Regions:
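Feature captures the catalytic cores and cofactor-binding loops of soluble hydro-lyases/lyases
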Residues: 2-140
Length: 140
């Protein structure tokens, strides 16, 4: 494992994966290809927190309104392509509260605002439709 003081550019994702080739089924995981980058940070990492929801971002917003302390929020949006679970306001809150990034198995919106936010954002794609606020879902 690299020294904590090493600059990020000196240690690539591939290097990190090389160090963990013997781990099978442990805590080390890599996301499959298919997620697009929308945030202001292209590379990010951190302890994971989770939200599971379907076309309702109430719990996503609630999570990102708390101190992130460098964590990454992974949102299981069931792969819905009909409603955006993260937009510009939510991304700005994530950056303001110290989250490293958000990974969405679903869609996001407000591409220009996401790109301007100081947080990493990965998602399946863009869709302009907002969510319906029902307060449903699960959060770790």
């Amino acid at each position: 494992m690299p020294q904590a003081a090493a600059p990020a550019a000196a240690f690539s994702t591939c290097d990190f994966c090389d160090l963990h080739t013997q781990e099978q089924g442990g805590p080390f995981r890599v996301l499959p290809p298919g997620l697009q980058s929308f945030g202001g940070r292209t590379a990010f990492f951190g302890q994971v927190s989770t939200v599971q929801c379907f076309e309702d971002n109430s719990l996503v917003k609630a999570a990102l309104d708390t101190p992130g302390a460098g964590r990454v929020l992974v949102v299981d949006g069931a792969g819905s392509l009909r409603r955006a679970l993260v937009g510009g306001n939510v991304a700005a809150a994530a950056a303001r509260n110290g989250w490293a990034g958000v990974v969405v198995h679903g869609c996001v919106r407000d591409a220009a605002e996401l790109a301007a936010a100081g947080v990493g954002i990965r998602a399946l794609g863009l869709v302009p439709m907002p969510t319906v606020k029902r307060g449903e879902g699960q959060r770790d």
